[in-house]
Amino acid sequence: MRRCRNIAASLVVLLSIILSVVSCNKDLDFDFGFKDLCFYHPHTAPVQVNVDWSKFRHLETPSGMTSYVWADNSEQKIAKFRSHNLNYITLNLLEGYYHAFVFNQTETEYTTIEFYNLDNFNKAEARVIEVKSSWYSTKLPDSKVGAEPEWLAIDCVQNIEVSEEMVAKAEAEYLATLPEAQRQQKYNEKNTKAPTKTQNEVGPLVPTSIIKNLDIYIHLENLPYLRSALGAVEDMAEGCYISSMSPTENHVTHTIGSWDVIYDTTENGGVDMMKGALKGTLSTFGLPAGHSGKPDDNNIYIKLLLVDNQTILEQDFPVGDIIADLNEYNGTQLDENGKPIWPEIHLYWPEPLPEVEPVGGGTGGFDVGVGDWSDDVEIILPLL
């Protein structure tokens, strides 16, 4: 019976300790979702890292953010934070130097991006997932087709200093929260006075998009004889290193199956139904590391199906020199209407499309239901 009473007493003590920890750390994020993470431990100092999303909100409004923190003398992360509070994160750190980065959302909310090596500040990276194409085959055995990435904004801070003085002041502030008798005893031991509560601030970090858009225009003549189009942009960056916000060395191909049609105008301002351009927009991590800016560094492959449902035309366009400055764009350059400026490529089909007979004797024209040609082709006609 005595042993049972001792066990019961021990359980009561243990439960009280757990409840006190939870009550003192009610905002601690156990990865169950977004919460403001705020905890205190003696011998640490609070550091508030401010975050400014103004350079990204016109692309997407984040609903939360994630931050990873490392000590300077270790490659292993010491903390991970997830928060609906987009304005700042509060870190409670031991004396030393620290690195951190933030990005919008959480890793699991992305469907086209996967994160790797997040335990290592210098090696952490984001990559597009591999997808299967119903019509495009890669040219090299180790190359792959990548999904178009969702919006991802990042910023980093290095060498956050937590000094001995900062820790001492924070420790004194902690003592000020103790009961009067215990507090006075501690102050007498330290021969110090109760301090004024302070907050050490860093930043703001200003996350910007590491995803770029590329607008591709394919100019054509004899547009009524075109039924559908497919495109592939080859040798783009597979991902980026998060801490340096620089592209990785690996390559992927992105396919384009959705196009808008933009007709030319005639001299009197009318619509020229025979001439125009197909416009496709590609989202990408940009150009891979080691890009030299030579034409053959990147290729745009276009495949056209004509209205006879038999004639297929193919064309390669070397564009490595044309898009050599793609990585300089991050969505912060805005036009007079406040919309982001992205680079454009204008490519011209070398000759007018052949005047073939429409299948079934119809009138021809664009058709998104193209059967075996592809399951994911869409051409949007403008309203005239």
Model regions: which residues?
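C-terminal structured domain segments
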Residues: 301-369
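Tryptophan-paired
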Residues: 64-113, 227-327, 384
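Sec-dependent bacterial lipoprotein signal peptides
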Residues: 1-25
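Short, low-complexity, Pro/Ser/Thr/Gly-rich segments in the mature regions of secreted, periplasmic
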Residues: 369-384
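Bacterial Sec-dependent N-terminal signal peptides
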Residues: 17-51
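Short, low-hydrophobicity acidic/polar segments
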Residues: 78-207
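A sequence/structural signal for flexible, mid-protein segments enriched
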Residues: 154, 159-267
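Structural motif
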Residues: 49-62, 218-225
